[in-house]
Amino acid sequence: ALMSMTTIAFAEGEDAKATNTVAVYDMTVNYGKLADALGLSIDQLESVEDVHKTFCVEMMNAANASKDERKPMVDKAIEKNLKYMHYILNTNQYRKYLLLLNTTMNNRGLNK
């Protein structure tokens, strides 16, 4: 009985660790607040939503990848996201977006 309780406790610990890892990579945002912060037009907002949804999927894929694959996947997702955002946003909007994304990545410990 003691052995099975230890196994359950270990499994719960692993599940919590996996959940925390996935939460760190969850890049879901409130698009209304993002639109306000960046001063987006309706057309820009639609494009930003599409690009950001793809970014969210790529970050979740990275979260679920092996530790060795994770960093290259995150780097590629960020590079692709920034390339598309640079096309959609004007210079001031892009600068603000970079600041927001960089702050988010730093706060989650993803910029190492």
Please report, for each region that a protein language model flagged, where it lies by residue.
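Charge-rich (acidic/polar
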Residues: F10-K112
